Amino acid sequence: MKVWLSDRNLKLAALFGASLGYCAVALLSLMPAAYRPHIIVVSDKLEHAVAYLLLGALSALAMRQPRHVHRLALAIVAYAGILELSQLLLPSRVASFEDFAASAGGAIVGVSIGALLIRRSATR
């Protein structure tokens, strides 16, 4: 019996999820504010942190190389910064350092969680 949750399939699923996540985050970050849905009603900062936490974890799982996670975290933080700065060019959006900080924090935590999961699965 072949297991469909092989390491290769998990990596592909994480890569697919991360790719969809990057597209969704870009779309939600750059669309007019009036049309943007609020998924977490409590705080938009929490939305940023959770979105980038998921991106970081899925990206780390797709990468499967824990020794390079610091570069991955830096790349995701740069992505968050570019999207936040891009909002300065849009009339219906407002860029804020607090949003960037929440995104960066979520990305770092997410990549760390992904790296821990990779290391844990490697020791089994």
Q: How would you name each of these model-derived features?
A:
Residues M1-F100, A104-R124:
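Bulky hydrophobic segments
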